[in-house]
């Protein structure tokens, strides 16, 4: 079971009815089912903030010391490493509950990027959601090897949902 909490701090998000708990749960489940190590966990939790440029700028400055709005910020609750996800190690312990983390999305930046990249707002949001969830479970793109692994997984998941890959 995946519990999703959505907080909307910007009314423009309400125009996109497809961006809802059901969509977020479906994508999260698709990602988690790819890794056997998550199979023992019965309940996952994920918090989503749908906000605007002013608020995300404050969060970006506070947590990353970058004074500019960004499309999305991910705050993992656990320090996971993507390499552990592919091993049979019991890296999650015996817990049957896991809070994946928090994700904050910025409406204006996502809107502008989707227009510039000739994508629908919803498809761009889905790509950023996939990217962010992968960050929450330990994926990163600090070097070319990690970036390629993460991008290939994103492409695979996007294709599953019928979305043309951006790379």
From Swiss-Prot:
GO terms for biological process: rRNA processing. Its cofactor is Zn(2+). One of its GO terms (molecular function) is RNA endonuclease activity. Pfam families: YbeY (PF02130). Keywords: Cytoplasm, Endonuclease, Hydrolase, Metal-binding, Nuclease, Ribosome biogenesis, rRNA processing, Zinc. It is found in: Cytoplasm. Gene3D superfamilies: Metalloproteases ('zincins'), catalytic domain. One of its GO terms (cellular component) is cytoplasm. Its EC number is 3.1.-.-. Binds 1 zinc ion. It comes from the Bacteria. Its main location: cytoplasm. Zn(2+) binds at residues 131, 135, 141. PANTHER family: ENDORIBONUCLEASE YBEY, CHLOROPLASTIC (PTHR46986:SF1). Single strand-specific metallo-endoribonuclease involved in late-stage 70S ribosome quality control and in maturation of the 3' terminus of the 16S rRNA. Belongs to the endoribonuclease YbeY family. This is Endoribonuclease YbeY. It comes from Rickettsia rickettsii (strain Sheila Smith). The lineage of its organism: Bacteria, Pseudomonadati, Pseudomonadota, Alphaproteobacteria, Rickettsiales. The gene is ybeY.
